Structures are given as structure tokens and as C-alpha cells.
Amino acid sequence: MQVFLDLDETLIHSIPVSRLGWTKSKPYPVKPFTVQDAGTPLSVMMGSSKAVNDGRKRLATRLSLFKRTVLTDHIMCWRPTLRTFLNGLFASGYKINVWTAASKPYALEVVKALNLKSYGMGLLVTAQDYPKGSVKRLKYLTGLDAVKIPLSNTAIVDDREEVKRAQPTRAVHIKPFTASSANTACSESDELKRVTASLAIIAGRSRRR
């Protein structure tokens, strides 16, 4: 079965490096795509305001709880146990694709950082590929020249509830990942197992048709 995975708040959570005080003239002092393990501190650019500095420190402390990759303009936090989830989908024979509301350049960076190509990732659908501001509906895929797949054998995983409402038998809602203290490895493992089980139900229905 084909599965389309959302990126932000589904697989990852990212913030602009500017929120930690860095700018193009003073870029984040780590090479893009450097992977930082959970527990390693983030670099913060100090400003002139104590309130701003305190806010940046709090943000850095929160993000340091998660495995991260430094992109060109963002710091990307990995959803805990994400690799186990992706390994499971691949081992079960799912064809992995990505559908994101983000821009193509940003999405390409995330795909590279997560090494989704190693899972045989097929399609990358970004903001430019479907009606602006609309809910992700699988039927839009039929209008893309690159998409030659039966929608009856397709599912989508997304954190936005309206995506699930738009196609209740083909979508799996996932709790948004916001890189908060509530996103523990245990809770995220349970959530991703639930998503995997929901996909298996959809796949089972597809096989019986």
C-alpha cells in the first residue's frame, strides 16, 4: 500500500534558527545537517534584552530534549522513535511518500536529513502541487502527472484533523508533535504504534476489495 506522510508536527518539529537569535549575517554555528543527540545543548545568540535572552534559553532547553538536525534556516527535532516507525513501515512493504504543506526547498532538506530515500521514498508532494490553502485530499493526486497509483490502495498520515475528516477511511490522524516535555519516548512510541495499527487496518480493507 502507498502511504503519504506529512512532515511538520507529524514526523518532525522545526523552528527557525532566528528564534535562538541567529541571522544570515551571524548564522547558527553548526554545519547544516549536523545531527545533535538529545541532551546536547543548543547554541543561543545573546541579545540586549534579559527577557528575550531568557526566552531563547528556555526554548533551547526544551529543544535539547530531542534528537535534532540543523538545516539551513531551521533546527529540526525528530519525533521520538521515528526511526523505528519508518523501519517498521518499510519492512511491512509500505511504499513511503511525502505530502507536506511546506515549500519544496524546505521539504527537500527534511527528506535529506531523515534519509527517507533509504526507504525507497517515491513521491514528494509540496505546497506548489495542490490548491493553496486547501485540505490535503488524496483525490488531488490524480491531477499530478507523476502520480500513477490507485487511490483505493493509498493512505495518508497527518496531524491535522481536517485531513482525517476529508477522507475518514483513507487517513490516519496523528497527535501533533510539538517538541514539548509531554512528547516522551514512551508516549510517542505508543502513538506511532497506534498509527501503524491504523494503517494495517486500511491496508487490510484494500486487500479485501
Swiss-Prot record:
One of its GO terms (molecular function) is hydrolase activity. Transmembrane segments: none annotated. Keywords: Hydrolase. InterPro entries: FCP1_dom, HAD-like_sf, HAD_sf, TIM50. SUPFAM superfamilies: HAD-like. The keyword Hydrolase applies. SMART domains: CPDc (SM00577). PROSITE patterns: FCP1. Residues 1-199 form the FCP1 homology domain. This is uncharacterized protein 037R. It comes from Frog virus 3 (isolate Goorha).
